[in-house]
Every structure is written in C-alpha cells, then in structure tokens.
C-alpha cells in the first residue's frame, strides 16, 4: 500500500522477480481500459515482467464498487494460492483494502427511484442544501463528505431513506474478515516534499506522453461524461474541465497536480490511522534493502 507516486509498481515488479508472488492491482483507476497515461498504468514492458490482475477489466462507462473488488480479488487470490503461489496486492485505493481485509457492512443496493427523487430535490435546493440536510441526519458522514461531492451525498441520503439508518451506523457493522494470513507493508518517502516533487514531475511526464490526447479521445465518446466515476479520477476531471473551456490548460495542470497531492495526503492519513500492524518502507531506500526487509518478515510468517 502507499500514496500515489510512491514507487509501489517498481517494488511489486521487484518482488515478482524475487518471490513466488502474483500481483493483484488494488486501484480504482487502473481497472479502466483506455485510461493508461493519466492513471500511470504499468507499461507493457512492466506488465511482462510482473503481470497485474484486475487491470483493464472495465470500460470507462461502467461503475465498480468495493464489493465488486472484494469479490474479484478473493477469486484471484484463490486461483493464485491454488497454484502454490502468494497473492501480492499492490495499490493505493484504501477503501478497497478495507473492504478486502474487514469485509463489507450491509449497505443496501442502489434504488433508482430514490436516487431520482434526491436528484430532483437537488435541482430545487442545490447539492449544498442537500449537504446541510445530510449534516443534520448524519453529522459524521456530512463532515467527511465534501459539499460539492454530489455522488457521495446522494448515496449517503439514499442509504438513510432506504434503511432508516445512517451510513455511519451501517458501516460500523463489519462483514466477513479476510481468510488469509496478511502481511501489510506501506511505502512512501519520509520527506513529504519528495512525494510532492514526484507527483509534479510525473504529471508533466504524463502531459508529454499525450495525456491531453487521451482525455480528448474519451471526451469524444457520447456515452462518457464528467460525472462518471472514471472521469472523476484525479487528472482526468481537471483535463475535462479544460476541454470544456472552463479553465485554461495551465490551470488544469496546476489543479491536477494539487488534486493528486491531496489524494496522496488522504492516502497517507488513512495509512497512519490504520489500526492493523503495518511495516513502513521508505521509497528512497535502495530496492535491495526493501526486499530484504520484506523477505525477512515474510519468512518469519509464512513458508515460502
């Protein structure tokens, strides 16, 4: 696990060359086909060295949930262990990790009629008005959800209208835990400034590789729009705004870099607050040092 641009892919590839592991991607952006540059998807050469499961499994027009991920990951893990190898989960979508490790709370399925009612109400009082309503119903979720995040506001209210219980109440009820012995490692630079620099450098590199053209191709599709989960991914959202004429290219790049840094901050905060035992690895340490530490801990825990 680790924040974006921390070196997770490079370490996963090195582990694939060293240990009997198979990589499973834990990334809510890498699941989408045709979204390669802006997601920093592993290259063809990298995937030849270390094939990643759960990459390129959906069209950008489709949605994917933590429940979907848990089901898919458990299936892949069963196949890997049946072949005598070890599942190596690598990525930065912390909600997916949480769902996999702890199971899912009993949240109801989406109800199109209730969602339509919420959206109709949003047209009358705005999403900010609905956010105030959410704060009154579920203060914890309301404080956590951004007033501009219509998707999450809609879902939180929908859950309450369906069940009569708040999202906070329901998510406190855990599902089935993971039936595996799990070793958890987090990778990040100790110096936050280093991570910020990496993020900026990578964003400009993505622009050189044709990120704008990648988004233009997506935007040309009539079935894609800015409110889809795929297009809401950091970088894509800001580039879409530029192509819509809402902001300049320089603003899109700046906002994209800022959004990526904010994502990294949330990922690190989540990891710091995670109540399970995590071994931290410094991104700047030599790969050989990180491999030795992982091998030592693994040898003490599982039979390789």
Curated annotation (Swiss-Prot):
Cofactor(s) listed in the protein's UniProt record: Mg(2+)
Keywords assigned: ATP-binding, Magnesium, Nucleotide-binding, Transferase, tRNA processing
Keyword Transmembrane found: no
Pfam families: IPPT
Residues carrying the site annotation Interaction with substrate tRNA: 93, 115
Annotated catalysed reactions: adenosine(37) in tRNA + dimethylallyl diphosphate = N(6)-dimethylallyladenosine(37) in tRNA + diphosphate
GO BP annotation list: tRNA modification
Class of the enzyme per the UniProt entry, highest EC level: transferase
Domain of life, per lineage: Bacteria
Binding site for ATP: 2-9
Residue segments, region Interaction with substrate tRNA: 27-30, 151-155, 232-237, 265-272
UniProt cross-references to PANTHER family, sorted A to Z: TRNA DIMETHYLALLYLTRANSFERASE
UniProt record similarity statement: Belongs to the IPP transferase family.
Role, per record: Catalyzes the transfer of a dimethylallyl group onto the adenine at position 37 in tRNAs that read codons beginning with uridine, leading to the formation of N6-(dimethylallyl)adenosine (i(6)A).
The protein's name: tRNA dimethylallyltransferase
Record lineage: Bacteria, Pseudomonadati, Pseudomonadota, Gammaproteobacteria, Pasteurellales
